[in-house]
Regions:
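RNase III-family endoribonuclease catalytic core
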Residues: 2-112
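Short, glycine/charged-enriched secondary-structure capping and boundary segments
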Residues: 21-22, 114, 144-147
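Short, conserved loop-to-beta-strand elements that form functional interface hotspots
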Residues: 97-106, 110-142
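C-terminal edge-of-domain segments
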Residues: 142-160
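SAM-dependent methyltransferases
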Residues: 1-2, 160
């Protein structure tokens, strides 16, 4: 069987006002991520990783921020659409390993809900979804709580 790996990364600014969604889950915080969509940094990194594994470009190619139909869209819908491409190409998702970097809030209490939601959407088990959290030790834009970012690796397998 053939395997392919993809890597994704995404960044968003943080500011007062918007809600903060990470890995489908709304996380209570005084700041939220700013973006054309709901700015779910983790789902965007996973989308980029799946697209990369298929050599189909990136999230901006498929869902341009110049297209009003994606304005404030729920990133779950983007993830589902990218996953449909994975299936159309004859692959399945094997596993995901991801890291989210932000100074605050602490997100690991929400990781089980994130894993469950992502696993459900991608038809895999929670054990196949790894979510880790880290900080920049107060360095840079993330350390100043001006933004956050996420990395994701996705392994896909060609179905027979």
């Amino acid at each position: 069987m053939s395997y392919r790996i993809g890597f994704g990364i995404d960044f968003h600014r943080l500011q007062q006002g918007p809600k903060l969604f990470i890995g489908v889950v709304e996380i209570p915080h005084s700041k939220g991520a700013v973006g054309h969509s709901d700015a779910d940094v983790l789902l965007h990194a996973i989308c980029d990783a799946m697209l990369g594994a298929l050599a189909l470009g990136d999230i901006g190619v498929h869902f341009p921020n110049t297209d009003e139909k994606y304005k404030d869209i729920d990133s779950k819908l983007l993830l589902i659409e990218v996953y449909q491409l994975v299936k159309q190409k004859g692959y399945r998702v094997v596993n995901i390993d991801s890291s989210v970097c932000l100074e605050a809030p602490k997100i690991m209490p929400y990781a089980p809900m994130m894993r469950q939601s992502i696993a459900f959407l991608l038809e895999i088990t929670e054990e196949d979804v790894s979510i880790k959290a880290t900080t920049t030790e107060k360095m840079g834009f993330a350390g100043r709580e001006e933004g956050l970012f996420a990395f994701a690796n996705v392994l896909i397998q060609k179905l027979q």
